[in-house]
Amino acid sequence: MNTSDQTFELAPDLRISRVVTGLWQVADLERDGNLINQDEAALAMKQYFDAGLTTFDMADHYGSAEDISGIFHKKYALGKAQLLTKWVPTPGTVKREQVRTAVQRALTRLQSEQIDLMQFHAWNYADPSWLDCLFWLQELKTEGLIKCLGLTNFDTAHLRIVLQSGIQVVTNQVCYSLLDHRASNKMAELCLHHNVKLLAFGTVAGGFLTEKWLDKPEPHLTNSLTWSQMKYKRFIDAAGGWQAFQQLLKALDLVAKKNNSSMANVASRYMLEQPAVGGVIIGARLGKSEHIKENQSLLSFSLDEESKNVIRTAIDKLTPIPGDCGDEYRKPPFLTASGDLSHHVETLPPPYPSYEGSDGRTKALSGTLWEDLAGFSRAVKKGNRILVSGTTATHGPKAIGGDDPAAQAHFVMDKIEGAIQSLGGTLDDVVRTRIFIRNIEDWEPIARAHGERFKDIQPANTMVKAELIGEEYLVEMEAEAIIKE
């Protein structure tokens, strides 16, 4: 096995192991409030490192994973391991100094002067503070505190917004497995076009894609399962249920025997060979359950076309997981351990401030300069109607989305959704949209973006070519919503 099979270049100064050791189960091990022994856990990380599995993935909320990694880094692998972490801010307004504080906290925990890869998660795209966070993270990257930026659980539309707005990201970490192929189409295509790599987690589905569950009765969703098992049991249910899942396991078993491998390794190897995938993340329960030799062997074989066809045939019989990457954290069905967001966030605050106006109306303001100068609101609620002003891809002094009409359109619809949320409605309440475009040749990507966001809502709509104010803007949109009394 040569080195190129084992590692992958995310950026000129960052090469990772193609099998990344995930540490999110540290949080599960500590869920009863009992911290694991950090020195022993750091020593367990060293065993992976010594075996050539030098890359570890964690987050600010994975229990004491960052602290453990810092001990490991200082004692055993200074400058030789790749420590990938995440920042998942609490929903709501974020200030510049909070971003620096979060990065400094990660550096302190990791006992490092530079974060190899800082991955960012956004809870609510309708709240534009997520863009502020990324622009400020990019400033800290320029400053040298961060080597590379990545995303986690971003969908295709918002990855497009990020890339077209000049934010330099090299990865998007998403759930991507035999059960969940949401990343295989538009996401993979966009990543290939922009040289962004997917880091695939969930490839063994919390251990369900193994011999242990072949021909076994269906487990119940109870606290006797690990958090990981609770999460991926929900994916199994969404993909067609236990009987359909058993057919997938039988296909995996067939391919595993042919390749003299384990079912888990076949499942992960299949994902590793998908377009745009830079690495697969396989979880470790440090000090409890290590699979070092098996993870090493994942890099020692490849699947022939016959094996892939057997797996594809089994996948095609499953029910596709709905939506795009990361939707499980933003809209029903919430495919999380708890089945909701209770383990993650308490509430999603309104994206924009609202104020009581005259004659019983309420207005929402997005903070753009012209709202004050021209005397208008982003949206006004009167009775059960919400009227949203003509909205462009403006955020502070920036035009978001560059020269990509679809990226601009998606950000415009984010702002519209944020204004409606701030006045007590949802995008489902929209009954009318009007779209004004600068260039007639942009009509189709803008219409398709509208179709993605309003696919099941289908409001009345008009699209016309217009002379927009501001040469940088390709699309302007307004909306009307009627909310339930």
Model regions: which residues?
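N-terminal presequence-like segments and the immediate start of the first folded domain
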Residues: 206, 222, 335-414, 418-428, ...
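Short, well-ordered amphipathic alpha-helical segments that serve as non-catalytic structural scaffolds
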Residues: 44, 97-107, 252, 407-421
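Structural preference for beta-strand elements that scaffold enzyme active sites
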Residues: 9, 16-20, 54-55, 61, ...
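N-terminal binding-site loop/beta-alpha segment at the start of enzyme catalytic domains
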Residues: 1-81, 350-353, 357, 374, ...
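Glycine/proline-rich, positively charged
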Residues: 29, 46, 93-182, 197
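Aromatic-lined glycan-binding groove of carbohydrate-active enzymes
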Residues: 14, 183-227, 262, 349
